[in-house]
Structures are given as C-alpha cells and as structure tokens.
Swiss-Prot record:
Component of the Mcm2-7 complex. The complex forms a toroidal hexameric ring with the proposed subunit order Mcm2-Mcm6-Mcm4-Mcm7-Mcm3-Mcm5 (By simililarity). The heterodimers of Mcm4/Mcm6 and Mcm3/Mcm5 interact with Mcm2 and Mcm7. Acts as a component of the MCM2-7 complex (MCM complex) which is the replicative helicase essential for 'once per cell cycle' DNA replication initiation and elongation in eukaryotic cells. Core component of CDC45-MCM-GINS (CMG) helicase, the molecular machine that unwinds template DNA during replication, and around which the replisome is built. The gene is Mcm6. This is DNA replication licensing factor Mcm6. Its EC number is 3.6.4.12. ATP binds at S392, T393, A394, K395, S396, N497. It catalyses: ATP + H2O = ADP + phosphate + H(+). It comes from Anopheles gambiae.
Length: 814
C-alpha cells in the first residue's frame, strides 16, 4: 500500500476495511478482560518509556473476542497493519501522556498455524503467518526511514509523512495545488521518522529438510524492539507477513559497470548523440520475497529438544505440558529397575552389541550440570564422545542414528568441513557490503549435538579451530574487523578410523589415531571397536542384519518408542543433581587410582590422565543421576562413571571369552611343546571315570565376559605368586603349584556360592578351562615338565600334577 500515491493535494483515499478494523481493534483493546480486568491496560503503561513502542497482543484473545476481526487480520494483515497501529496509539494516548509524535506498533503472538520456510509462496504475501527456522546470519542494526518529510524545491512546500516502500521513495507530486513538481524534492532529516532496522537470514532446520534437498533460506526484517534479540544458531518463531522488496543486490552486479565503461573508452565519439540506451547496461528492477516480522519468540517445542531455557524449566512445568498418558509413561519409565539397559535397547535397536558405546552415548544425551564459578568462569556440562574403530564396526551408524533422533543435531564430515564451516565464517553482505557472521556447524548445534564423521581426516589447522568450542564452549572470531565471542554449547560425537585402517593392539591409542593430545584430552569418553573374527559374534551380527532385511518390524527389540525416550530425556535433563560427600570422596579416590596407574612404569593408559578426566567422571556421574531422575549423585553413580571412563581409557573393547573354542588350540599346543599325545597317554580308571562325568557338564557352553575372565585369572595368578613367595621364604625344595592344588584352592574359595553338586562340577570344569587358556592361549602360566631321577613316564599320570608357575614378566592388570 503506497499511501503517498493517494495524495492529490490534501486528499487521502479512505480505506473502509481499514477504518472498520481500526474501530473493532480499539474496541477489543478497551473491552477484552481477563480475570475481571482489562488485560492490556497494564502493558500499555510501559509504552510511555522511550525504548518501548510495541504492544504485544495474543491472537487467541482476538479470536475469542471477534472471529470476523481475526479473519480480517489473517487475510489482510499488511493492508490494515497501519490502522491497527493507529488503534494502539489512540488507546495509549487516551490513558497515558504519550507524545503525539511517537509511533506505536502492534505485534501478534500465539498465531495458530506454523509454516515451514519451504512452504512460503506468493499466495501468502500480505497475510499474517508464523514461520520457524534457524538463524544462520545476522546483520548489524541500521536506521530505516519510515515516514519522510520532504520540501519541494520549487515552492518550498513541506510534505509530511511520506511512507517509504522499502526503498527511498519521493512524493509522487507536490501537494501544493499550483505546483506541478514531481522530481525536485529534498529530505528534511530532522523532521523524518527513523526506526531501528535489522536483517537476519533464517534457514530450514535439519529435521524439516527433505532428504537430499538443499536447505531453503529467507531474509527476515526486524524492527524496533526486536532488533538484536536473535542470535546465530538459535531457532525462533517469527510472526509477520511475506512481502516483496526490490532486489537491490542485482542492480550492483559488475556486468553493468563494465559495459558502461566500454562505451566511453573512446573520446572521439563524445559529441555524438546518445543512442542504444539498452546497450548502456540498464537493468530491469527485480524483486525478491522477504519476511517482515512483528514478533520473535524462541522456538519451544513441547518435547522436541532442548530449545527451552533449561534454567527456567521445572518438573512441574514439564508435567503441566504433558497429557496424563504421557506423564504416566514417564513415571513408569523412571521406576523401571532395568531402565539403563532398556533405554539403550530402544535407542539403538538395529545395532548389535557394543553396549558400552551405547551407554556412553546415552549419558551424553542426558549431559552433566553446567556450573558458573564466582569468577564467572563457566564449567561445561556437555559430554564429548569419540568412537575409534576398524571399518564396518557401526561407527557412522551410531552418528546417523543420534543425528536423526536428537532434534537439534548437526551431522557433518570432517574431510569436507573447514574451520570456518565448523565454527563461524565472516562474509560480506551482497547489498550493504558490510562484514557479517555466518554460523557454522557448532553454532547451529548450540544446545544440541554435533556429529563429526571421519574426524581423523580433518586437516590439523581445522582441528585446532574447535579446541575452544570443545572446552570453553565458545567461539572467538577476529576477522575483517569483526570481533565477537559466540556460543557453541554443544556435545561432540566424533568417529575416527585408526592409522592404516586397522587398530594395532600393540600400540597405544595415541599411536593409533591422528589426533593431537589437546584434542584427545577434551573427549570425555573414548571407545575402541576392533573387528575380530569370532564365530559366535559374527553369527549374531549376520543374523541381526538378515532379520533387518527380511522383516524389519519384528527384528527390532524396542521396549520404549523413540517418542517415549525423547520425552523422558527431555524431562530428566531438567534435574540438577548435587554431589554427596560420600560420592565426592569416591571421586577423589578413583582419580588417584587413575593418576597412579598413569605415572607408574607399568601404566597401561592411552594418554596422560589430567584434571579433565576428573571433570569427565563428575559429568558422567551427574548424567547417571539425571537418568534416574535423582536430585543427588551417589556412590553408585560414581562407580558406573568410573567403570565407563576406566573402560574407555585403559583397554581396548574386548569381546566375551568363549572357553569352548580353546579345546582344539589346547590339544595343538600340547603337541607343540613336546607333551604326550592323547593316544599315547596312559589312561587310569580314575581318569576314565572323570571322562564319563565331565561330558555331561561340559555340554553347556562356557562363556565369560572379559571382565570376569580377567578377575578370575588375576585371582589365580596372585595366589600362585603368594605360594611361590612362601616357598621361597621357607626354602622348600619345590617350584610352583600343581594344577590339582590350584583347582582345589579355587573351589574352596567359592564353596559358599555353591548349592549343589552340579554347580560344583560346572565350576570345576570352568576353572580347568580358564587354567588351560592361561597356559596355552595367553601363556601367562608356564607348566614345568622337569623329570627327576627315578621317575618314569608312568609316574606323570595326566597333567593334573604338573607344576605351574607364573611367567616372570607378567604384570597383573587391575
């Protein structure tokens, strides 16, 4: 609507629809009541302040008051917006001492329908709509001429309140009836009205983006109090209208200037007349769509992510936002005794095994508690996880599932990402040529998760760029005269391949991956996945993959739906557990163990243990407490955090030990070291009876977890070394302990746990298998086969009485 075109002399065209809406809206402001009082009377008093000029109105109130008025505002918003602002000005002036020269504006919130950026089309121009998107670029604030006062240079007539149509607009004609001037006007700056103006660019969010499509973006124009209220990387709801503005940037392309210059290079044609105006580089004025916003609100989806300020959210607020069925489900999940296991099964149903990795990622989703010290130093609460492993160990699958599951997650590849693409870039605006900041992946994932695949393929100078973001959670920029510190409160989930494609167990973690020590120390958890040839594991993985391809619905073992898990994580994140004194003492003790192991000559740590690992333990303990909706961090939470941290730092991820597979290797090794073959070994009645009893027990598969196997082997080794020390101190003429004595000692240690003869026989077979594995596979125990004078081969009946000693170079690992 160009109001200036309507002026002929002193006449103005009367818009009946606008005037009618102005009266109805003024009646709404004066009559709408809530709790017996006029709702907008109190907020009007704030508009007297010089820095306030906008009245915020809930669109739901307008719908409840007059449906016809609400429909007119929706359909003809841009047309009647000046009349609505005039209603606000009249309403304020009637009740306060507002200056006549001050303009007031209206902004609507709670508009029911939300549109995506991709859905914007010319049919929505001029209507009131609400769009949502992620801010990727913010421009500096500029003054905008809204109502200009001009002076006619022919008759000196003053022409007031000439509306500007998104570009500098002169009056169409002088308002003096006797003056026909249409071109010669001068702007009176001191009598014109300027307001603050800021342009931002929003982009489709990752969740709304169709697969394989480039994200769409749109320019959003902010005015008055709305300037400087948005930050790059955050998601907002913008309420306003779609407008068409001149594409000034297209007029400034270099082609026109070059063509004009070529026409005037030769001076001999200077006296010629002007011909061929189109060849002078004149361009048609193009237009583009933009969004004129009247209100800005942070996107606060019900349970879609962490967009709500977590410092303001309480359990009661979140309970009020749930339906009774949703709240009952959250309460039921919080009381689940197997919640830890059920959550990881529901979160990664299509990935077999790797439970420790799943637990680490689950705790990363809950996060720790961010804290601020008295010196205003921020201690991060986000947990960073790195997965290192051989090809085809589901590293990228973990990242893709997390990026699809988390509502505010950004997935990127390390090789295809630069330092500016990860942090922030300083680019030049195509219209004003000012330098502006464009958000990178870490800023776009603010309050979310940034998944970086092929992390080891990044260039070293690009890895250095995220040092600050990983620990201080800020990004500092000093480029092209722009100095800024931006938020990057994100958790980083990275995946990397070892050097050479395969993990070398003989080397430490730092020797296996191309990451610097500063980067490695900033990760809270490192998980190492090794692709080992194991018949049982390979069969289970193959069965899982075939099931997924054949009947996907039936192969997923999900206890809770993804919506239930997301709702529960959102609810649990608002807890801020406090560390109890007992847990505090255990944290210090565990940290001391890690440091001692690191400084010792026999240390097995993958890198230096620093205070950052202590902070990692604290964050993991807080995440465990959050998962259980607990207000306190107890010793149990600290033990699980220490176990996870210890597992990721100290040793490679190990599969279960299948003792049945060692029988063949044992027989081969017996022949290799010169023992008698089973056919040559004399058989006694006692051994025949044992052979008859053993198969019935041994038919059961013997499988131990790696931790159980190590605990059992350490128990045997420590006892054998104690016996060796005792024999040496007593000067006994004997070396080592027999296998029978070792088995009997172990059975005496666990006799309290045995309730039947069958359990005793099972435990006996188990310890025999463990000892055989320690002898023939791990070579931790050495059998002594030294024959003495007077002994024959028949005296060595079987290997039960073989003397066993511990390898002198073996070191017990805790």
């Amino acid at each position: 609507m160009d109001v200036a075109d309507a002026h002929v002399g002193q006449l103005r065209v009367r818009d009946e629809v606008g005037v009618r809406c102005q009266k109805l809206f003024l009646d709404f402001l004066e009559e709408f009541k809530e709790d017996g009082e006029i709702k907008y009377l109190k907020t009007v008093e704030n508009l007297v302040n010089p820095d306030r000029s906008t009245l915020e109105v809930s669109f739901e109130d307008v719908e409840n008051y007059n449906q016809t008025l609400a429909t007119a505002i929706i359909e003809e918003y841009y047309r009647i917006f000046p009349y609505l602002c005039q209603s606000v000005s009249n309403f304020v002036r009637d009740r306060t001492s507002l200056k006549k020269s001050k303009e007031c504006y209206v902004s609507f919130v709670d508009v029911p329908t939300r549109h995506k950026v991709r859905e914007l089309s010319t049919s929505k121009i001029g209507t009131l709509i609400r769009i949502s998107g992620q801010v990727v670029r913010t421009h500096p604030v500029h003054p905008e001429l809204v109502l200009g006062t001009f002076v006619c240079l022919d008759c000196q007539t003053e022409i007031r309140d000439v509306e500007q149509q998104f570009k500098f607009t002169n009056p169409t004609i002088c308002r003096n009836p006797v003056c026909a001037n249409r071109r010669r006007f001068m702007l009176e700056v001191d009598k014109s009205l300027f307001i603050d103006f800021q342009k931002v660019r929003i982009q489709e969010t990752q969740a709304e983006l169709p697969r394989g499509c480039i994200p769409r973006s749109v320019e959003v124009i902010l005015r008055a109090e709305m300037v400087e209220t948005v930050q790059a990387g955050d998601r907002y709801d913008f309420t306003g209208t779609l407008i068409v503005i001149p594409d000034v940037g297209a007029l400034q392309l270099p082609g026109a200037k070059a063509e004009i210059g070529s026409r005037h290079k030769q001076g001999d044609n200077a006296a010629e007349g002007v011909r061929g105006l189109k060849a002078l580089g004149m361009r048609d004025l193009n237009y583009k769509m933009a969004f004129l916003a009247c209100s800005v609100q942070v996107t606060s989806s019900r349970f879609g992510g962490t967009d709500m300020p977590m410092s303001e959210v309480t359990s009661q607020i979140m309970k009020d936002q749930m339906t009774p069925a949703e709240w009952n489900k959250v309460y039921e999940m919080s009381r689940d005794p197997r919640l830890y296991q059920n959550l990881i099964n529901s979160l990664f149903p299509s990935i077999y095994g790797n439970d420790e990795v799943k637990r680490g990622i689950l705790l990363m989703l809950f996060g720790g508690v961010a804290k601020t010290t008295q010196e205003k130093t921020t201690l991060r609460g986000d947990i960073n996880v790195c997965i290192v492993g051989d090809p085809s160990t589901a590293k990228s699958q973990f990242l893709k599932q997390v990026s699809d599951f988390s509502p505010r997650a950004v997935y990127t590849s390390g090789k295809a990402s630069s330092a500016a693409g990860l942090t922030a870039a300083v680019v030049r605006d195509e219209e004003s040529f000012d330098f502006v900041i464009e958000a990178g992946a870490l800023m776009l994932a603010d309050n979310g998760i940034c998944c970086i695949d092929e992390f080891d393929k990044m260039d070293p100078h690009d890895q250095v760029a995220i040092h600050e973001a990983m620990e201080q959670q800020t990004i500092s920029i000093a480029k092209a005269g722009v100095r800024a510190t931006l938020n990057a409160r994100t958790s980083i989930l990275a995946a990397a391949n070892p050097i050479g494609g395969r993990y070398d167990r003989s080397k430490s973690l730092q020797q296996n991956i191309q990451l610097t020590a500063p980067i490695m120390s900033r990760f809270d958890l490192f998980f190492i996945l090794v692709d080992e040839c194991n018949e049982v594991v390979d069969y289970a993985i193959a069965r899982k993959i075939v099931d997924l391809h054949s009947h996907i619905e039936h192969s997923l073992d999900q206890v809770y739906s993804r919506e239930d898990v997301l709702r529960y994580i959102m609810f649990a994140r608002q807890f801020k557990p406090v560390i109890q004194p007992e847990a505090m003492a255990l944290l210090v003790e565990n940290y001391g163990h890690l440091r001692q192991r690191d400084t010792g000559t026999t240390g097995k740590s993958t890198w230096r243990i620093t205070v950052r690992q202590l902070e990692s333990m604290i964050r993991l303990s807080e995440a465990m407490a959050k998962m259980e909706c607990s207000e306190e961090v107890t010793e149990r939470h600290v033990k699980e955090a220490y176990r996870l941290l210890n597992k990721s730092i100290i040793r490679v991820e190990q599969p279960d030990i299948h003792l049945d597979e060692e029988e063949g290797e044992e027989n081969e090794n017996v022949m290799d070291i010169g023992e008698e073959t089973p056919e040559d070994t004399p058989r006694t009645n006692e051994t025949e009876e044992n052979d008859q009893d053993t198969p019935a027990v041994a038919k059961k598969k013997l499988t131990l977890s790696f931790e159980e196997y190590k605990n059992l082997s350490n128990m045997l080794v420590i006892h054998m070394r104690n016996e060796e020390s005792r024999m040496e101190s007593e000067e006994l003429d004997r070396e080592g302990i027999s296998k029978t004595e070792l088995i009997n000692w172990y059975l005496s240690q666990v006799e309290d746990q045995l309730e039947s003869v069958e359990e005793l026989m099972e435990r006996k077979v188990l310890i025999e298998k463990v000892i055989d594995r320690l002898i023939y596979h791990d070579q931790v125990i050495i059998p002594l086969k030294q024959a003495k004078l007077g002994e024959t081969d028949q005296d060595d009946a079987g290997d039960q009485d073989v003397l066993l000693v511990v390898h002198p170079n073996y070191i017990v690992e805790s």
